C-alpha cells in the first residue's frame, strides 16, 4: 500500500538547496520531509531550520538539523508544511496539530511555501475538517458564547485524557465544527476581528506549491 504522506513529504526536499533557511512545519506528512532532510544533512547538506512547534524542534534536533528561532533569522527561503484541507484557490485549513499560530508566522516570513498532502486533503469546499481558533484562556467561554449566539458551533479541544489541550504558546483551541466556508475571505475578516482570538486556521494567501501524493503512487505538483 502506497504511503501518500511519505512520497509527498520526501518529494518536497527536492526544492531545498545548500545554504537555505528552511521552515519546518508540523504534522504527520511533513514528518517525512524532516526525516529526509535529516538524511540529507548527514550527507553534507548545509541548511538552517526554523521549527513551528516543540514536536518538530525535537525531531529536527534528534536528526542533527541545525535550528534557529524565528527571531534569529531575517528571512526564510522555503517552508514545507502540511494541511488539513486545501481547495482549488490555494486556500486551506491548518491547525489540526495545534501549531497554527507559529505555522502562520513562519509562513508569513517565507519567500516560498510548499504544502505536502495526500490526495484526500484536496477539496472543492473547505469545512469538512474543523477550523481551529487559538484563543487566550482568559475569557474563552465568552468567545465561544459569542460565536454560538451568531450560529457558529464550536468545541473546546481536549486531550485524550479529558484535560484541556494547550498549545505550545499556553493557549486554548476552539474548533469550529459543522460549518462550510464558502467565503473564506469573509470568515477571515470575521474571526480576525474578535478580541481574544489570536489566530485562526484559514491560510488564504500563503501557499505557492502543493505536492500531492496519490494512492496510485503518482505525485502531482500543483503550482499557483
From Swiss-Prot:
Lineage: superkingdom: Bacteria
The GO annotation for biological process reads: pentose-phosphate shunt, non-oxidative branch
Where substrate binds, per the record, is at 26-29, 81-84, 94-97, 121
Complex and partners: Homodimer.
- Protein name per the record: Ribose-5-phosphate isomerase A
User: Looking at the keywords, is Isomerase present?
Assistant: yes
Similarity section: Belongs to the ribose 5-phosphate isomerase family.
Q: In which pathway does it act?
A: Carbohydrate degradation; pentose phosphate pathway; D-ribose 5-phosphate from D-ribulose 5-phosphate (non-oxidative stage): step 1/1
Gene responsible for this protein:
rpiA
Tell me if Isomerase is a UniProt keyword of this record.
yes
Give a single Pfam family match. Rib_5-P_isom_A
A GO molecular-function descriptor:
ribose-5-phosphate isomerase activity
Broad EC category: isomerase
Name the residues annotated as catalytic in the UniProt entry: 103 (proton acceptor)
Keywords on this record?
Isomerase
Q: Which reaction does it catalyse?
A: aldehydo-D-ribose 5-phosphate = D-ribulose 5-phosphate
What is this protein's function per UniProt?
Answer: Catalyzes the reversible conversion of ribose-5-phosphate to ribulose 5-phosphate.
Supply the EC number(s).
5.3.1.6
Amino acid at each position: 500500500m502506497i504511503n501518500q504522506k511519505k512520497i509527498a513529504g520526501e518529494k518536497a526536499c527536492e526544492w531545498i538547496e545548500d545554504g537555505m533557511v528552511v521552515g519546518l512545519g508540523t504534522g504527520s506528512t511533513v514528518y517525512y520531509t524532516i526525516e529526509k532532510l535529516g538524511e540529507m544533512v548527514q550527507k553534507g547538506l548545509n541548511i538552517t531550520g526554523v521549527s513551528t512547534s516543540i514536536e518538530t524542534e525535537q525531531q529536527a534536533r534528534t536528526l542533527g538539523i541545525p535550528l534557529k528561532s524565528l527571531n534569529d533569522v531575517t528571512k526564510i527561503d522555503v517552508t514545507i508544511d502540511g494541511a488539513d484541507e486545501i481547495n482549488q484557490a490555494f486556500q486551506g485549513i491548518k491547525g489540526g496539530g495545534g501549531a497554527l499560530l507559529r505555522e502562520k508566522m513562519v509562513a508569513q516570513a517565507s519567500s516560498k511555501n510548499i504544502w505536502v498532502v495526500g490526495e484526500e486533503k484536496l477539496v472543492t469546499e473547505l469545512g469538512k475538517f474543523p477550523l481551529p481558533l487559538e484563543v487566550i484562556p482568559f475569557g474563552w467561554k465568552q468567545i465561544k458564547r459569542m460565536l454560538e449566539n451568531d450560529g457558529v458551533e464550536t468545541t473546546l479541544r481536549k486531550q485524550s485524557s479529558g484535560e484541556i489541550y494547550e498549545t505550545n504558546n499556553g493557549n486554548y483551541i476552539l474548533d469550529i465544527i459543522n460549518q462550510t466556508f464558502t467565503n473564506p475571505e469573509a470568515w477571515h475578516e470575521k474571526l480576525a476581528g474578535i478580541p481574544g482570538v489570536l489566530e485562526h486556521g484559514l491560510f488564504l494567501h500563503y501557499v505557492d506549491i502543493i505536492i500531492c501524493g496519490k494512492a496510485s503512487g503518482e505525485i502531482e505538483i500543483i503550482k499557483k
